[in-house]
């Protein structure tokens, strides 16, 4: 597919700003949601320049300075920065691992306070690769509604499952008892971070949803940050999303299998992952995570992230990108495992 051709639409030379985004772009996103089983009307969608901006808009909508949001642990470290820029505090709820990952709903309930304005879920989570299950989604909606908190559902990696699972919630978009904002974007869904287009879809009780949309429209109108060319290109790009996703999905799955095969029978354990672009390797705590990262970089020529970047509760975990070219990933994985064997 020629992405540049889609960006060359002459209509992009006309500037006709719409705070929520051009209707054809929003209609293309509704079709993308429909593929995941959700019927989302175009007037439920608001475009942003990135999912980070979508978070920023949501925090402006939901929070006053000093309010709190709940985020998963372990997860992506950007939440602290996004919240801090809005003078919002971050508390965490744990994801537990017992062979598979799951939300500790009881601890989430304990973490909710009168100043909690939103609960963030990432499905699949980065870096654990765990999807929110339908049973967890129902519990989350009930808890959020009881505490008058919104749900921010980050679904940027939803198109990259590693296996099928009928218990999985394909999206948290549903008009349940809690205001819900579902986030996505071209950066992950089409592997095009340079195009800077993301979105949020609003669900929940009608009154709360309509008030949220009106207020978000004011926020978006204040910035008008989404470029016209990418909005014109979005329908053509999203129509070919499956073609863009397929090679990424194949590479990620293949690299994960290579890593599992390399680690088999060694002191290194590959944790279960259901989706996303990362793998987690549990290694012996004979070194600190920083020491593991440095020795692998300096002596083996392999780059990995330490688990504490993602707020793992204990050592020693290493996070690997599964996006590396296979001819680079396979020897890199072998060098990691060999280093672990020599250090155990």
Tell me what each language-model feature is:
Residues 109-110, 286, 295-304, 310-344:
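PLP-dependent enzyme catalytic core of the Aspartate aminotransferase-like
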Residues 67, 88, 146-150, 177-178:
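A short helix->loop->beta-strand "cap" motif at the edges of active sites that frequently abuts
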Residues 97-168:
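Active-site phosphate-binding strand-loop segment of PLP-dependent enzymes
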Residues 179-253, 340:
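Conserved core segment of the aminotransferase class I/II
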Residues 1-50, 57, 237-240, 303, ...:
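N-terminal small-domain helix-loop-helix segment of the aminotransferase-like
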Residues 86, 146-147, 266, 300, ...:
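Helix C-cap/helix->beta junction micro-motif
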Residues 235, 251-260, 270-283, 314:
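Conserved glycine-rich beta-strand-loop-beta hairpin in the small C-terminal domain of fold type I
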Residues 60-121, 142:
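PLP-dependent aminotransferase-like
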